[in-house]
Amino acid sequence: MGDQEILILVDENDNEIGTDTRENCHSGKGRRHRAYTAFIFHGGKMLLQQRSRKKLLWPGAWDVSFTSHVYPGETYQQAASRRALQELNARVGPLTDVYSFVYFAPQGENAENEFCRVLVGDFNGEFTPNADEMMSVKWAGIKEVEADLRVHPDSYTPWFKLSFEGFLKSPASKRYA
């Protein structure tokens, strides 16, 4: 799909207001579009990925288990299932929607400008990271991530920090503490 990937433009309440290309949605100040982040857990630890150096935005930064955009005609769950296969070569079960936020994060001449839902769930299967998407992965406990964020906040994507903060405030976080 490349730069012709079509994304859903939304307002601050996630109401659809149109579509545009991925390139236009991330160029300059960007255009607000629909996205999600997903945290998957196994044995009380969350899967984190380190973004590929090939990424346009925040290459090499630590990120959520997987993340992407919701395409026209897709639900958040369908988008998460699609992306788990692309990024992790894995199938994930239903994920729980725990939080949403709107953010703008510029980097150079590009930016993220998204309405983002945070999805959380358990994962007990095998996976194979897609090297085009990520450099490495690690499993980490919530307390370990909190401590690392305090010491190395710039090592994480802006949406990771917002997603993690919202997740910690949600009742779902108690299940994984």
Annotate each language-model stretch with its function:
Residues E23-S27, S100-P106:
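Short, solvent-exposed loop/turn elements at beta->coil junctions and helix N-caps
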Residues R91-S100:
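A short coil-to-beta-strand element that immediately follows conserved catalytic motifs
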Residues G60, Y99-Y103, N110-A177:
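Nudix hydrolase/Nudix homology domain
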Residues N24-Y36, F41-R82, V151:
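Conserved Nudix-box catalytic region and its N-terminal flanking loop in Nudix hydrolases
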Residues G2-T37:
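Acidic, metal-coordinating catalytic segment for phosphate/diphosphate chemistry
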